[in-house]
């Protein structure tokens, strides 16, 4: 069983090399750099913002017309869509780095992916294609289990569903879009999760944002992790419930704030809360941290709350058979009231699911805006998911699924260990395939991405507003399809680019 010992979280699980029956997981896997780093980063961003604001004023007053202040003359009299800070940041900082975001791919996003080459000659306002393409090692796609292929049993199953059912179901679940394929994949997912029932939706973001309002209302209380995904935040806002934010992955802080809130009344109704919903994620997509699930289950049981677990990045990616953080920690899935996950990442399809008791899932079927008004998941996407889940559960008669899970775990541990040995500051837990490398400076993360592309390696550069203004980072997404040769080549390139950009903010760790 998972649990806590001496303030450290402990879980059960096995790895291929020297089984680890007790994995000690740091509860604060986000180490801080030297004290002066944030001061220097603050100075850097302040100077850039002051320069941007001065340029904006000069342009507005007609003193100097900058090339960066390009706009549509037909919209000069329009009110701006965003606030002045966002506009200044976008025009003078973000736009200069648009070459490292929204990169167009022209092939299957596997371990190797093709990118369309492009350049800008107007400070990022437009990108022009060169007519050539580059093959790069792919560290940007969420292809955790390596199911993103254009051939093989999953692709064949998807093609067979097109032949049999076509592309579109033609309506919502409550109208004529309730397809037999939906019931089949929902049954498969429920069995995989070891819950009573499940329901699928055609979009992962909407699985959260459109369904949370069906679970709580303005008389309810939501306890939400500070770093929860935007889809969860949107769902909380749409629900109208009073939302209290607790410190990241801190069940004790969650309990304190829950207890304080229960001593009062809902500020929206003036009455006692009618229900409480705690919302957490399995793996946090920008930090790479694995949730301390046993501690949150303990809080849920103590206060009779509903527990909502978003496994967008953890389903398929952790656990001996990829069943997510409940399996990883050795917890009973039925202690989690709503198990949400996306089908776009580990299973290389599209959409999302919710799993739980039949009573909860039937409630969602009846009251969710997604089932009432949204069109349904496409048959070939369903086939891709169903085949991938069967492989991961071992019901295809092979050991492929388990080997994928083992390989992903080995890749995650090896890559993280080697980055730390080189002196990089890396966020997240050792078993997480989401690997953030901290650069802190937005200027450094942009240059880091550009230089990695010269080594034919595609990475994700992340900055504000996806992260705090002073905490820009590179994010590597590992896959079971990455070979050791891939990882060693990447590590050599990362070390070289790290020296060129000055991004060694960690302490060299020789042995972990």
UniProtKB/Swiss-Prot annotation:
GO cellular component: membrane; serine palmitoyltransferase complex
Family: Belongs to the class-II pyridoxal-phosphate-dependent aminotransferase family.
Gene encoding the protein: sptl-3
Pathway(s) where this gene product acts: Lipid metabolism; sphingolipid metabolism
Top-level EC class as recorded in UniProt: transferase
The UniProt record lists the keyword Acyltransferase: yes
Stored PROSITE patterns: AA_TRANSFER_CLASS_2
Subunit structure: Heterodimer of sptl-1/sptl-3.
Cofactor: pyridoxal 5'-phosphate
E.C. designation(s): 2.3.1.50
CDD domains: KBL_like
Chain's role: Component of the serine palmitoyltransferase (SPT) that catalyzes the first committed step in sphingolipid biosynthesis, which is the condensation of an acyl-CoA species and L-serine. The catalytic core is composed of a heterodimer of sptl-1 and sptl-2 or sptl-1 and sptl-3. Required for the specification of abicobasal polarity and development of the gut lumen.
Regions crossing the membrane: none
PTM-bearing positions, type N6-(pyridoxal phosphate)lysine: 345
GO molecular function per UniProt: pyridoxal phosphate binding; serine C-palmitoyltransferase activity
Keyword Lipid metabolism applies: yes
Annotated GO biological process: ceramide biosynthetic process; sphingosine biosynthetic process
Catalytic activity: L-serine + hexadecanoyl-CoA + H(+) = 3-oxosphinganine + CO2 + CoA
Keywords: Acyltransferase, Lipid metabolism, Pyridoxal phosphate, Sphingolipid metabolism, Transferase
Protein name listed in UniProt: Serine palmitoyltransferase 3
One Pfam family hit: Aminotran_1_2
Disulfide bonds: none
């Amino acid at each position: 069983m998972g649990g806590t010992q001496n303030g450290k979280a402990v879980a059960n699980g096995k790895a291929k090399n020297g089984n680890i029956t007790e994995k000690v997981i740091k509860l604060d896997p986000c180490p801080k750099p030297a004290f002066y780093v944030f001061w220097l980063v603050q100075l850097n961003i302040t100077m850039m913002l002051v320069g941007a604001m001065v340029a904006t004023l000069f342009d507005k007053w007609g003193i100097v017309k900058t090339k960066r202040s390009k706009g549509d003359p037909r919209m000069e009299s329009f009110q701006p869509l965003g606030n002045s800070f966002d506009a200044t940041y976008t025009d003078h900082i973000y736009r200069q780095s648009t070459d490292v975001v929204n990169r167009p791919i022209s092939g299957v996003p596997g371990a190797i992916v093709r990118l369309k080459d492009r350049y800008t000659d107007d400070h990022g306002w437009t990108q022009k294609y060169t007519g050539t393409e580059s093959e790069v090692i792919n560290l940007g796609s969420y292809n955790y289990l390596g199911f993103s292929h254009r051939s093989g049993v999953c692709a064949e199953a998807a093609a067979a569903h097109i032949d049999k059912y076509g592309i579109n179901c033609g309506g919502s679940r409550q109208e004529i879009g309730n397809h037999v394929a939906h019931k089949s994949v929902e049954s498969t997912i429920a069995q995989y999760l070891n819950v009573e029932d499940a329901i699928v939706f055609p979009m992962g973001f909407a699985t959260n944002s459109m369904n949370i309002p069906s679970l709580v209302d303005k008389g309810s209380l939501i306890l939400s992790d500070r770093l929860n995904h935007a889809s969860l935040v949107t769902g909380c806002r749409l629900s109208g419930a009073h939302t209290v934010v607790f410190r990241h992955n801190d069940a004790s802080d969650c309990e304190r704030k829950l207890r304080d809130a229960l001593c009062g009344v809902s500020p929206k109704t003036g009455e006692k809360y009618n229900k409480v919903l705690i919302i957490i994620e399995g793996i946090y997509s920008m930090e790479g941290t694995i949730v301390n699930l046993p501690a949150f289950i303990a809080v849920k049981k103590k206060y009779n709350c509903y527990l909502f677990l978003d496994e967008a990045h953890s389903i398929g990616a952790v656990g001996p058979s990829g069943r997510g953080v409940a399996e990883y920690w050795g917890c009973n899935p039925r202690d989690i009231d709503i198990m949400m996950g996306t089908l776009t990442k580990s299973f290389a399809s599209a959409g999302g699911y919710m799993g739980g008791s039949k009573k909860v899932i039937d409630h969602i079927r009846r009251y969710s805006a997604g089932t009432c008004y949204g069109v349904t998941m496409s048959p070939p996407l369903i086939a891709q998911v169903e085949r991938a889940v069967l492989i991961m559960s071992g019901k295809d008669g092979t050991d492929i699924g388990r080997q994928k899970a083992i390989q992903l775990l080995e890749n995650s541990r090896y890559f993280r260990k080697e980055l730390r040995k080189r002196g990089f500051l890396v966020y997240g837990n050792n078993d997480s395939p989401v690997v953030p490398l901290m650069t802190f400076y937005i200027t450094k993360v942009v240059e880091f991405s550009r230089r990695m592309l010269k080594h034919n390696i595609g990475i994700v550069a992340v900055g504000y507003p996806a992260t705090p203004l002073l905490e820009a980072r590179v994010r590597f997404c590992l896959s079971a399809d990455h070979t050791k040769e891939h990882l060693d080549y990447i590590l050599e390139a990362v070390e070289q680019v790290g020296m060129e950009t000055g991004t060694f903010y960690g302490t060299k760790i020789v042995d972990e």
